[in-house]
């Protein structure tokens, strides 16, 4: 490698996976079909087949026993680019990188002994620097494979894992200081391998996979729009550098997926289609040897800007699997729009079962479904639709949510006209739907034939529907039909500090109970809870209440006040009809 082959850029994605400050990134065009300087490039292809692409400096022979080399490390921090096209001050369009059957990517380490990291491998459809990347694609076809190497995480100040940036990246269209549009990644029955070092019995790895990605080293805005990530066969596998098989070994892959992502600007109209993703691989002869992946999916994301009109479609052929990994928890997250300055008109569609039989129990277990996440700005017109599905992890659904950074609370300025519709769904832990903002109005949450089942032995965090505003919560509707929940804490509330008005909760054919042998729990149903609660309506038809042995356990009212001397409640209405079955004691 000659130094004059290396390019340097001011960028944000460089030192660790969570960093957003501007720093210098060094880039090496490692394997490029077409490279231009101050010119555009189109219709180029890079096809990899029947071979291994490796960055290894020393390859230990498999058929000869020799002494391992000294454990020296170059500690390089380079982005190794493998792409059909590389433009410097030019646009890249309609280019393809194709990974075919028996092609194997093993980039990012300098030896096969301790797997010391020596760079961040980028497998890309096309890359444009100081230009736009449009209509490019990365195809990872059946029978191909990509390796992910160990990357030890550190905890940031918010308690999140942050990895060394020298991890594997798969990108459809990449731009430095440019826009990305209509780029695609197709993953079809491909093998994704966690490669662990010798003398280890547990390992962590990380991966970034994005159909369109923009890195930026200035304050100028760039747009990631209409990019598509399509996954129909992400098959997790593992490889260990042990001379003989250990008694136990556990690898965990943290994988982040984006339809479109920008460091600075807007993420608009990006899509993820998630069809088949196998996240657990066990050894045939020893179930104590296994690899597992924990996922975050973001249809559209901006680290400094808005995320609007993005869509995440989940229709899994096989549900995600759960395992008792060495981390002690199972957690997956799905985001429609992830932003800092506004997230609107984002949609999450879910069909078919989400997870398999529950083996794990931890306070950290979660299936997070977040239509909109933003630190400020509006979170309006976001939607979550779930139909004919099941989860054995606790389910937390947010149309808009509070965020805590550096011990400070951040709320969207508004959460209006959001919608959650859940039909024919069972959660075998807890089910919670939350909307949190400074103002929340005209939101709708609808259940039809939904179960929230809590086993006695499970860690019970309660099942809830809560619309909560710091200022006003008006004209919201919670409509529940054919619903049952036996969580210890059932709460169905519309609440705001200053005003809760013209809200409506409708409950038809519903059962509330407690799974615990103690038969102790809390049930709260209040259509308007505020310092000023008025014109709220609670309608109940055919309600079944199981045994609650503890006192002060059931609160059902169209409105309630906070207890302040100036608080007021008026013009609220309660309707109760049909069969009201209450446990005799």
Predicted feature residues:
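Surface-exposed loop/turn motifs in large extracellular/passenger domains
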Residues: 1-169, 173-296, 300-333, 337-552, ...
């Amino acid at each position: 490698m000659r130094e004059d082959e290396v390019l340097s850029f001011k960028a944000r994605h460089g030192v660790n996976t969570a960093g957003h400050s501007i720093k210098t990134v060094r880039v090496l065009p490692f394997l490029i079909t077409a490279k231009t300087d101050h010119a555009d490039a189109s219709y180029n292809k890079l096809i990899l087949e029947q071979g291994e692409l490796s960055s290894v400096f020393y390859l230990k022979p498999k058929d000869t026993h020799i002494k391992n080399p000294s454990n020296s490390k170059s500690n390089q921090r380079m982005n190794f680019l493998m792409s059909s096209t590389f433009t410097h001050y030019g646009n890249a369009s309609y280019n393809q990188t194709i990974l075919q059957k028996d092609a194997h990517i093993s980039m990012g380490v300098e030896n096969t002994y301790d797997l010391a990291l020596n760079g961040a491998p980028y497998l890309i459809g096309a890359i444009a620097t100081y230009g736009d990347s449009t209509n490019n694609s990365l195809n990872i076809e059946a029978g191909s494979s990509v390796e992910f190497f160990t990357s030890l995480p550190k905890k940031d100040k918010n308690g999140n894992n942050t990895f060394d940036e020298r991890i594997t990246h798969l990108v459809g269209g990449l731009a430095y200081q440019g826009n990305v549009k209509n780029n695609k990644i197709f993953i079809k029955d491909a093998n994704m391998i966690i490669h662990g070092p010798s003398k280890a019995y547990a390992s962590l790895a990380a991966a970034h996979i994005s159909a369109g990605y923009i890195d930026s080293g200035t304050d100028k805005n760039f747009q990631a729009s209409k990019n598509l990530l399509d996954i129909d066969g992400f098959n997790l596998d593992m490889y260990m550098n042990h001379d003989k098989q250990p008694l136990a070994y556990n690898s965990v892959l943290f994988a982040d997926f984006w339809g479109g992502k920008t460091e600075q600007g807007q993420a608009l109209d990006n899509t993820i289609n998630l069809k088949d993703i196998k996240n657990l691989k066990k050894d045939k002869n020893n179930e104590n040897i296994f690899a597992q992946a924990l996922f975050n999916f973001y249809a559209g994301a901006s680290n400094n800007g808005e995320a609007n009109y993005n869509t995440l479609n989940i229709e899994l052929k096989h549900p995600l699997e759960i395992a008792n990994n060495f981390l002690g928890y199972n957690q997956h997250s799905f985001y429609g729009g992830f932003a800092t300055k506004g997230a609107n008109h984002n949609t999450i569609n879910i069909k078919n079962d989400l997870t398999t039989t529950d083996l794990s129990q931890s306070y950290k277990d979660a299936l997070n479904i977040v239509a909109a996440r933003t630190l400020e700005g509006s979170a309006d017109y976001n939607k979550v639709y779930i139909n004919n599905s099941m989860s054995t992890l606790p389910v937390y659904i947010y149309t808009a949510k509070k965020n805590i950074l550096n011990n400070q609370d951040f709320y969207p300025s508004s959460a209006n006209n959001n919608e959650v519709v859940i039909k024919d769904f069972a959660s075998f832990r807890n089910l919670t739907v939350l909307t949190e903002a400074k103002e929340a109005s005209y939101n709708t949450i609808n259940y039809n034939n939904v179960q929230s089942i809590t086993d006695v032995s499970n860690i019970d965090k309660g099942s809830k529907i809560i619309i909560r505003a710091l200022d006003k919560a008006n004209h919201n509707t919670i409509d529940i039909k054919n619903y049952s929940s036996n969580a210890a804490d059932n709460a169905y509330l519309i609440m705001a500090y200053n005003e809760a008005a013209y809200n409506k909760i409708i409950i038809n054919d519903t059962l509330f109970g407690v799974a615990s042998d103690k038969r102790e729990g809390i049930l709260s149903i209040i259509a308007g809870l505020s310092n000023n609660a008025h014109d709220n309506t609670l309608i109940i038809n055919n309600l079944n209440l199981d045994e609650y042995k503890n006192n002060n356990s059931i609160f059902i009212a169209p409105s309630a006040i906070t207890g302040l001397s100036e608080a007021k409640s008026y013009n609220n209405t309660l309707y109760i009809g049909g069969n009201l079955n209450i446990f005799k004691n």
